[in-house]
Amino acid sequence: MGQEKHVFTIDWAGRQLTVEAGQLAKQANGAVMVRYGDTAVLSTATASKEPKPLDFFPLTVNYEERLYAVGKIPGGFIKREGRPSEKAVLASRLIDRPIRPLFADGFRNEVQVISIVMSVDQDCSSEMAAMFGSSLALCVSDIPFEGPIAGVTVGRIDGKFVINPTVDQLEKSDINLIVAGTKDAINMVEAGADEVPEEIMLEAIMFGHEEIKRLIAFQEEIVAAVGKEKTEIELYEIDEELSEKVKSLAEPDLLSAIQVHEKHAREDAINEVKNAVVAKFEEEEHDEDTIKKVKQTLSKLVKNEVRRLITEEKVRPDGRGVDQIRPLSSEVGLLPRTHGSGLFTRGQTQALSVCTLGALGDVQILDGLGVEESKRFMHHYNFPQFSVGETGPMRGPGRREIGHGALGERALEPVIPNEKDFPYTVRLVSEVLESNGSTSQASICASTLAMMDAGVPIKAPVAGIAMGLVKSGEYYTVLTDIQGMEDALGDMDFKVAGTEKGVTALQMDIKIEGLSREILEEALQQAKKGRMEILNSMLSTLGESRKELSQYAPKILTMNINPDKIRDVIGPSGKQINKIIEDTGVKIDIEQDGTIFISSTDESSNQKAKKIIEDLVREVEVGQLYLGKVKRIEKFGAFVEIFSGKDGLVHISELALERVGKVEDVVKIGDEILVKVTEIDKQGRVNLSRKAVLREEKEKEQEQQQS
């Protein structure tokens, strides 16, 4: 079989984007190699030939990192890649979210989209290349897909927007926005920002969309040249006659059940109606397939009725107005031995966050494809089953937990004080205790309170809120503070976090093809109003960060030494620094510029370690007097330690004013004597004199007697 390779090229933000099709992974339904600068990503799309007997679309998106892409060999004994890194999980979610809405309702064939990162140029995003490649692999395949989509990164430097900023440019940018969409609309947003106003964030999104249109035109050109004909598939549909029968049996009672305000009572009421309808069909002895379709019809009926109530009557399941927030409450200082804790409750959503402060040596070490080697601020999110009143296995964090944790981290990072002002590692853990929607945003609010309780001098408090949307034709309703049912049955989950001044994080997922500028603008403004209300509630609990850290938090002492003296502090094979740590019980972190951070829960231990280090790096000055201790005696003189780690020789002729026959006649080991530095020779050896000190003292006495 021949290997006909088709190559397509375009300029993308000043760097070359090349697509190769037809040579690699030809047994997949669709495959492309995307080269962006020196970044290379192989993206493939594969689908099962038959639909799966499921009531959801089985799509899997994987972004696979290979350390060979940056010339690294994995650490550990196994020497191969293990479980995906946090960055890989987030990238998989990033690609999944814009492509998922573009498969037809009722499509049940299993689809797997895999992107393998094979080479990384740090200034050419492998995530953006993988998103482009994933869309294109689906488009050139025979898998039914209503794309293409594309995504870009948008930065803002000195007030000007930049597409796909380099690593250096991102350092100067106050926005790090990833936006994806079709040629007609936006369908995914992920952003971090330094308290940027909503209006500017909206302009950044629309700026990114213009570049997306160009990338989609490029994909359409490639599809026209090498794309396969799409497979005809049979979509899963429910018989209309059955639907009408189910509707007639359920509708009267379902409407009132949907409008029960309390979550569990509402679920019970809806289930009661569903069970009654299913029971009637079971009495008529219908087969299992029909019963399954009845249950699916009932679920669809609930969805349609909730959406109708919201769009036509502006009525929400719990009775709130469209822009009304659920009851708010918060509390701090719940856990006495932790460094800081905050509890935030919004309706039936509740999060408890705990702040832990550590030394700079406690940073998280990153071993991935990026340039970042460590991070000193972390936010971890846990979602136990009891938060929704269910049982289930206790597993490690999944994609959702990692994604929500990262969103909170992004929202809070802009307000974390820098290392110079606050030399601590900060770890936040958010425990979701109750869930009825917007738990990620509740964790942001609780984390802000926990840091303030811990005494972290944050630049400003941060609050988060989740906005929803129900769209029917040209009509739509934007919802403030969506609960679980509105999230599940609505068209959008738009999370906005920020301070009083502006936005620090955005995340938008939708289930429809895209959103217009008008809807985005309305959602952002409505979110701002809600965020201010939440911030006011939080600040009524704790108005500002505590002035003092917890007594259980480590105390950190900072000192600076000459960088050339770092080796003296560390010692051969770390012997010296390990001895200091062992003797004082502190942690010591040394920067290359000579900054030293000493930490422990005991301030006196810090001071003790500081004194030892000061003595180690102290420079001996000729002519200076020192009170030293005799450490060793030889025939020719006495060795005196003038400060920790520094000895000098007092020759026998320099011990006294008169002639000395034997060193032991004047000093013994352990004696403290005042000596003067007379010389430091070329080999760094220090010569001391007691005679010089005695002579000076005698001369002073004579002067005083004469006067």
From Swiss-Prot:
Catalytic reaction(s) noted: RNA(n+1) + phosphate = RNA(n) + a ribonucleoside 5'-diphosphate
Tell me where in this chain the S1 motif domain is found: 623-691
* Location within or outside the cell: Cytoplasm
Its EC number(s): 2.7.7.8
Q: Please state what class of enzyme this protein is.
A: transferase
Statement: the UniProt record of this protein carries the keyword Transferase: yes
Keywords, alphabetical: Cytoplasm, Magnesium, Metal-binding, Nucleotidyltransferase, RNA-binding, Transferase
Name the residues that bind Mg(2+). Answer: D487, D493
> Any idea which GO molecular function terms this record carries?
3'-5'-RNA exonuclease activity; magnesium ion binding; polyribonucleotide nucleotidyltransferase activity; RNA binding
Gene3D superfamilies (UniProt xref): GHMP Kinase, N-terminal domain, K Homology domain, type 1, Nucleic acid-binding proteins
Q: Has UniProt tagged this entry with the keyword Transmembrane helix?
A: no
Cellular component per GO, a single term = cytosol
Q: What sequence ranges are listed for the domain KH?
A: 554-613
**What CDD domains is this protein classified in?**
KH-I_PNPase, RNase_PH_PNPase_1, RNase_PH_PNPase_2, S1_PNPase
Cofactors: Mg(2+)
The organism's place on the tree of life at top rank: Bacteria
Task: Give GO terms for biological process.
Answer: mRNA catabolic process; RNA processing
Instruction: Report the function annotation for this chain.
Output: Involved in mRNA degradation. Catalyzes the phosphorolysis of single-stranded polyribonucleotides processively in the 3'- to 5'-direction.
HAMAP family on file: PNPase
Entry's PANTHER family?
A: POLYRIBONUCLEOTIDE NUCLEOTIDYLTRANSFERASE, POLYRIBONUCLEOTIDE NUCLEOTIDYLTRANSFERASE 1, MITOCHONDRIAL
Family assignment from sequence similarity: Belongs to the polyribonucleotide nucleotidyltransferase family.
The protein's name is Polyribonucleotide nucleotidyltransferase
